[in-house]
Protein backbone atom coordinates (compact mmCIF):
# COMPACT_ATOMS: atom_id res chain seq x y z
CA UNK A 1 0.00 0.00 0.00
CA UNK A 2 1.24 3.48 -0.91
CA UNK A 3 0.28 6.27 1.43
CA UNK A 4 1.43 9.73 2.31
CA UNK A 5 0.09 12.61 4.33
CA UNK A 6 1.25 16.20 4.36
CA UNK A 7 0.01 19.27 6.16
CA UNK A 8 1.23 22.84 6.13
CA UNK A 9 3.30 22.29 2.99
CA UNK A 10 2.64 25.22 0.69
CA UNK A 11 3.78 25.36 -2.90
CA UNK A 12 2.51 26.69 -6.19
CA UNK A 13 1.81 24.42 -9.16
CA UNK A 14 4.96 25.80 -10.83
CA UNK A 15 7.05 24.93 -7.78
CA UNK A 16 5.61 21.40 -7.87
CA UNK A 17 6.46 21.23 -11.58
CA UNK A 18 10.05 22.24 -10.81
CA UNK A 19 10.28 19.51 -8.17
CA UNK A 20 8.81 16.89 -10.53
CA UNK A 21 11.33 17.96 -13.16
CA UNK A 22 14.20 17.55 -10.69
CA UNK A 23 13.03 14.03 -9.82
CA UNK A 24 12.68 13.18 -13.52
CA UNK A 25 16.11 14.52 -14.51
CA UNK A 26 18.17 13.16 -11.64
CA UNK A 27 18.25 16.17 -9.32
CA UNK A 28 18.77 19.40 -11.27
CA UNK A 29 16.45 22.15 -10.02
CA UNK A 30 15.85 24.96 -12.50
CA UNK A 31 14.75 28.54 -11.87
CA UNK A 32 11.06 29.02 -12.52
CA UNK A 33 10.69 30.98 -15.74
CA UNK A 34 7.61 31.62 -17.82
CA UNK A 35 8.05 32.95 -21.36
CA UNK A 36 5.66 35.88 -21.83
CA UNK A 37 5.39 35.55 -25.61
CA UNK A 38 6.40 33.40 -28.59
CA UNK A 39 9.68 35.27 -29.06
CA UNK A 40 10.73 34.53 -25.47
CA UNK A 41 9.64 30.90 -25.94
CA UNK A 42 11.84 30.56 -29.05
CA UNK A 43 14.85 32.02 -27.21
CA UNK A 44 14.19 30.24 -23.92
CA UNK A 45 17.29 29.07 -22.05
CA UNK A 46 16.81 27.05 -18.85
CA UNK A 47 18.80 28.32 -15.87
CA UNK A 48 20.05 25.92 -13.21
CA UNK A 49 19.24 26.96 -9.66
CA UNK A 50 21.04 24.11 -7.91
CA UNK A 51 21.58 20.37 -7.80
CA UNK A 52 19.51 18.48 -5.25
CA UNK A 53 21.23 15.58 -3.52
CA UNK A 54 18.46 13.10 -4.36
CA UNK A 55 20.18 10.63 -6.69
CA UNK A 56 20.06 7.92 -4.02
CA UNK A 57 16.35 8.55 -3.37
CA UNK A 58 15.13 8.50 -6.96
CA UNK A 59 15.27 4.67 -7.29
CA UNK A 60 12.95 4.53 -4.27
CA UNK A 61 10.65 7.40 -5.27
CA UNK A 62 10.08 6.65 -8.97
CA UNK A 63 8.72 3.09 -8.59
CA UNK A 64 6.15 4.37 -6.10
CA UNK A 65 5.15 7.16 -8.46
CA UNK A 66 4.81 4.68 -11.35
CA UNK A 67 2.76 2.34 -9.13
CA UNK A 68 0.42 5.22 -8.24
CA UNK A 69 -0.35 5.61 -11.96
CA UNK A 70 -0.45 1.90 -12.76
CA UNK A 71 -2.65 0.77 -9.89
CA UNK A 72 -3.12 3.51 -7.29
CA UNK A 73 -4.90 6.81 -6.81
CA UNK A 74 -3.47 8.19 -10.08
CA UNK A 75 -4.59 5.36 -12.37
CA UNK A 76 -6.81 7.76 -14.33
CA UNK A 77 -3.56 9.22 -15.72
CA UNK A 78 -2.48 5.87 -17.20
CA UNK A 79 -1.48 6.01 -20.85
CA UNK A 80 0.44 3.81 -23.26
CA UNK A 81 3.61 5.58 -22.11
CA UNK A 82 5.37 5.24 -18.79
CA UNK A 83 4.05 7.99 -16.51
CA UNK A 84 5.12 8.57 -12.92
CA UNK A 85 3.01 10.76 -10.67
CA UNK A 86 1.62 11.64 -7.27
CA UNK A 87 -1.87 12.77 -6.33
CA UNK A 88 -2.73 15.00 -3.44
CA UNK A 89 -5.80 16.48 -1.84
CA UNK A 90 -6.00 19.19 0.75
CA UNK A 91 -8.69 21.23 2.42
CA UNK A 92 -8.48 24.88 3.34
CA UNK A 93 -11.45 26.71 4.85
CA UNK A 94 -13.74 23.86 3.76
CA UNK A 95 -12.59 24.18 0.11
CA UNK A 96 -11.09 21.07 -1.45
CA UNK A 97 -8.01 21.26 -3.65
CA UNK A 98 -6.83 18.28 -5.65
CA UNK A 99 -3.54 18.13 -7.44
CA UNK A 100 -1.50 15.74 -9.53
CA UNK A 101 2.18 16.15 -10.37
CA UNK A 102 3.70 13.89 -13.01
CA UNK A 103 6.29 13.27 -15.69
CA UNK A 104 6.58 10.87 -18.61
CA UNK A 105 9.49 8.48 -19.03
CA UNK A 106 9.10 7.34 -22.63
CA UNK A 107 9.79 8.82 -26.01
CA UNK A 108 12.22 11.48 -27.10
CA UNK A 109 10.38 14.37 -25.43
CA UNK A 110 10.06 14.56 -21.68
CA UNK A 111 7.23 16.48 -20.12
CA UNK A 112 6.07 17.45 -16.65
CA UNK A 113 2.32 17.93 -16.17
CA UNK A 114 0.85 19.41 -13.00
CA UNK A 115 -2.90 19.83 -12.55
CA UNK A 116 -4.56 21.71 -9.69
CA UNK A 117 -8.35 21.54 -9.32
CA UNK A 118 -10.51 23.38 -6.83
CA UNK A 119 -13.90 22.46 -5.43
CA UNK A 120 -15.58 19.11 -5.53
CA UNK A 121 -15.23 16.18 -3.19
CA UNK A 122 -12.42 15.56 -0.71
CA UNK A 123 -11.01 12.92 -3.10
CA UNK A 124 -10.42 15.30 -6.02
CA UNK A 125 -6.72 14.36 -6.48
CA UNK A 126 -7.57 11.34 -8.66
CA UNK A 127 -9.74 13.60 -10.85
CA UNK A 128 -6.70 15.86 -11.38
CA UNK A 129 -4.76 12.74 -12.44
CA UNK A 130 -7.46 12.08 -15.05
CA UNK A 131 -7.05 15.56 -16.50
CA UNK A 132 -3.27 15.09 -16.73
CA UNK A 133 -3.83 11.69 -18.33
CA UNK A 134 -5.95 13.34 -21.01
CA UNK A 135 -3.10 15.79 -21.71
CA UNK A 136 -0.64 12.91 -22.12
CA UNK A 137 -3.09 10.95 -24.32
CA UNK A 138 -3.77 13.90 -26.61
CA UNK A 139 -0.07 14.66 -26.99
CA UNK A 140 0.61 10.97 -27.60
CA UNK A 141 -2.08 10.93 -30.30
CA UNK A 142 -0.16 13.68 -32.14
CA UNK A 143 3.15 11.75 -31.81
CA UNK A 144 4.51 14.57 -29.66
CA UNK A 145 6.72 12.21 -27.65
CA UNK A 146 8.12 10.39 -30.69
CA UNK A 147 9.69 13.46 -32.28
CA UNK A 148 12.54 15.42 -30.67
CA UNK A 149 12.41 18.30 -33.18
CA UNK A 150 12.01 21.62 -31.35
CA UNK A 151 8.47 22.97 -31.49
CA UNK A 152 7.68 26.56 -30.74
CA UNK A 153 4.41 27.58 -29.22
CA UNK A 154 1.93 25.73 -27.10
CA UNK A 155 0.14 22.71 -28.56
CA UNK A 156 -3.44 23.40 -29.64
CA UNK A 157 -4.82 21.23 -26.86
CA UNK A 158 -3.79 23.76 -24.23
CA UNK A 159 -6.32 26.30 -25.46
CA UNK A 160 -9.13 23.77 -25.58
CA UNK A 161 -11.18 22.55 -22.67
CA UNK A 162 -10.14 19.10 -21.54
CA UNK A 163 -12.78 16.93 -19.96
CA UNK A 164 -12.06 13.49 -18.74
CA UNK A 165 -14.72 10.81 -18.14
CA UNK A 166 -12.44 7.89 -17.14
Protein language model regions, located:
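Active-site beta-strand/loop architecture of penicillin-binding DD-peptidases
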Residues: 1-49, 56-59, 65-146
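Short, highly charged C-terminal tails/helix-capping segments
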Residues: 146-166
Amino acid sequence: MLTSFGEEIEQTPLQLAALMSAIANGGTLYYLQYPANQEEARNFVPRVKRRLDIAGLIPVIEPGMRAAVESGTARRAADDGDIAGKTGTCTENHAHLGWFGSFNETGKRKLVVVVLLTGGRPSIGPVAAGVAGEVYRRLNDTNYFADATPRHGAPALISSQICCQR
